[in-house]
Swiss-Prot record:
NCBIfam families reported in the protein's UniProt record: aroC, PRK05382.1
Pathway terms, separated by semicolons: Metabolic intermediate biosynthesis; chorismate biosynthesis; chorismate from D-erythrose 4-phosphate and phosphoenolpyruvate: step 7/7
Protein family according to the UniProt entry: Belongs to the chorismate synthase family.
Cysteines paired by S-S bonds: none
Assembly: Homotetramer.
The protein's Enzyme Commission number: 4.2.3.5
Cofactor: FMNH2
GO molecular function: chorismate synthase activity; FMN binding
Flavoprotein is among the record's keywords: yes
Entry keyword set: Amino-acid biosynthesis, Aromatic amino acid biosynthesis, FAD, Flavoprotein, FMN, Lyase, NADP
Protein name: Chorismate synthase
Protein source organism: Bartonella quintana (strain Toulouse) (Rochalimaea quintana)
GO biological process, any: chorismate biosynthetic process
């Protein structure tokens, strides 16, 4: 299985399976001299970690990150400095229950990658879904924590803005609220609504989809290039690579199709500091594939977890009709834990373009 690497200069290769001994990533192209601590990386992993509420999978993983290469430990024993060589990060699996998947050894779960993996490779890892499991994304979150360190002042924040048919009220958006509830939602009034809805979905043995929004601030103008190296192209690719993501939009996205040219145009004026000021941000911070200096705004849709407890029609590996019921521990709404994953992937895409711009142009916005 190829294509496990993302990026051009800041390259992240993830490895490992959901029910293997461990998983992790190798980061190649990280500049030397970047300082960080394992505690900083761990804080992002803790945000994604399973088993922290009844709204996520009850699989209990500590997700303690270990660093194997590419850094020098400073005198304080905590600060690490990158050397410019490959950085290897490892996260051990400690709570696998492969026996839960015994009933689907020869069956394909509807909506899952079981069938397509088998068609392509002639073999599949039925234990937890292997590389098709959301567990694979833990390593991406670790890489994203380092990516944030490369672009000076970069802030990447995500929020869950819809679960099933329930949407937040954007007038109540509060970034401080995101860290105060298990849904990472910026609308405090939607917390009990989301809670009741997911409780109902879980009791019915089913799952539900979600919508996530990511905002990246302090992104320099000039990142990206026309045609085949557009920043929004790579951001979309990074988000679509996340397991269970089925759609991505930048800025107003599909809503732009309903606007007129006057409504959609991000008009400009010169600010008092001598720098351009945009009067709106319909483009989501990217014009012609190049960052404008405005906040980059992206949203992605996460499908319902296909591993559910209700009976569904499918076939087995011999072509026989079967009814499938999936046992095991699964997220009733995997979109919740996709928030830190989306943050990480956008951070990696921006860091990669930052290094590419620095190498090609050598300067940033005036």
């Amino acid at each position: 299985m190829s294509h496990n690497t993302f990026g051009h200069l800041f390259r992240v290769t993830t490895w490992g399976e959901s029910h293997g001994v461990a998983l992790g990533c190798v980061i190649d192209g990280c500049p030397p001299g970047i300082t960080f601590t394992l505690a900083e990386i761990q804080s992002y992993l803790d945000k994604r970690r399973p088993g922290q509420s009844r709204y996520t999978t009850q699989r209990r993983e500590l997700d303690q990150v270990e660093i194997l290469s590419g850094v020098i430990v400073q005198d304080d024993g905590a600060t690490l400095v990158t050397t410019g060589t490959p950085i290897s990060l490892l996260i051990r699996n400690t709570d696998q229950r492969s026996k839960d998947y015994g009933s689907i050894v020869h069956q394909y779960r509807p909506g899952h990658a079981d069938y397509t993996y088998d068609v392509k490779y002639g073999i599949r890892d039925f234990q937890g879904g292997g590389r098709a499991s959301a567990r694979e994304t833990a390593a991406r979150v670790a890489a994203g924590a380092l990516a944030r360190k490369i672009v000076p002042g970069l802030i990447v924040r995500g929020a869950l803005i819809a679960i099933g048919p329930h949407n937040i009220n954007r007038d109540r958006w509060d970034w401080l609220e995101v860290e105060n509830n298990p849904f990472f939602t910026p609308d405090a009034e939607m917390v009990p609504v989301f809670s009741d809805y997911i409780d109902t979905v879980r009791k019915n043995g089913s799952s539900v989809g979600a919508l996530v929004e990511i905002v990246a601030e302090n992104v320099p103008a000039g990142l990206g290039a026309p045609i085949y190296a557009k920043l929004d192209q790579d951001i979309a690719s990074s988000l679509m690579s996340i397991n269970a993501v089925k759609g991505v939009e930048i800025g107003d996205g599909f809503a732009a199709a309903c606007l007129t040219g006057e409504e959609n145009a991000d008009e400009m004026r010169m600010g008092s500091d001598g720098k351009p000021v945009f009067l709106s941000n319909h483009a989501g911070g990217i014009l012609g594939g190049i960052s404008s200096g405005q906040p980059i705004v992206a949203r992605f849709a996460v499908k319902p977890t296909p591993s559910i407890l209700t009976s569904r029609r499918s076939i087995d590996v011999d072509g026989n009709d079967v009814n499938v019921i999936t046992k095991g521990r699964h997220d009733p709404c995997v979109g919740i834990r996709a928030v830190p994953v989306g943050e990480a992937m956008i951070a990696c895409a921006i860091a990669d373009h930052y290094l590419r711009h620095r190498g090609q142009v050598g300067r940033f916005e005036r």
